Design a protein with these regions (language model features):
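A structural "domain/chain start" motif
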Residues: 4-59, 63, 122-127, 151-160
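Hydrophobic beta-strand residues in large extracellular and virion-surface proteins
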Residues: 26-28, 54, 79, 110-112, ...
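Short coil/turn segments at secondary-structure junctions
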Residues: 34-42, 94, 130-138
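Short, well-structured beta-strand/strand-turn elements
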Residues: 60-72
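Surface-exposed short loop/turn segments
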Residues: 69-120, 130-133
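Short secondary-structure boundary motifs at beta->alpha junctions and helix caps
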Residues: 100-105, 113-159
Length: 160
């Protein structure tokens, strides 16, 4: 019985590994902060949060990693991002006005390049925190909405 269980677990691990071969890879670099923008968050922590967020949103089509694989089997895309503006949220305004006003917001500019360095997505967006995630920790409340926006743009670009 134990051997059978070990065999099944090994087979499952092998099938997961084989199914990920050939899928395009998205490498998520740490975002940078534009000159003059004071952002109270750690960009490396934001990167570590973006990777699993993008895995959830794009995991069926792409392998999402934080570092470029040494021997990639398929297409490799690289995500570069910059926070070009940031506005802190206003708790009093959220409490009094409601309806999502006073949320933390950030202006982001990001691009995705293919292996040859050709830009396949070049976008500038304003991202606001989700209404239900107002009290997040040290990388702020923007990781999830940034990942949602980037995943949406990748789907729109129909990368393969």
């Amino acid at each position: 019985m134990i051997r059978l269980l070990g065999f099944i677990v090994g087979l499952a691990a092998l099938s997961v590994n084989l199914s990920s071969q050939g899928r395009p890879v998205v490498v998520v670099n740490a975002f940078t902060v534009a000159a003059g923008v004071e952002l109270p968050y750690d960009m490396e922590l934001l990167q570590k949060q973006l990777v699993p967020e993008l895995k959830v949103l794009l995991g069926k089509q792409f392998d999402v990693v934080a570092e470029r694989p040494q021997a990639a089997q398929g297409t490799v895309y690289v995500l570069y991002g910059e926070i070009s503006g940031w506005r802190a949220g206003n708790a009093a305004k959220r409490l009094i006005v409601g309806l999502g006003s006073g949320r933390e917001a950030s202006d982001i500019q990001y691009r995705i390049t293919d292996a040859s360095g050709t830009t396949v997505v070049d976008q500038k967006d304003t991202v606001r925190t989700n209404f239900y995630s107002q009290q997040a920790g040290s990388s702020g409340t923007l990781a999830h909405p940034i990942a949602q926006k980037i995943a949406e743009r990748i789907r729109d670009a129909r990368l393969k």
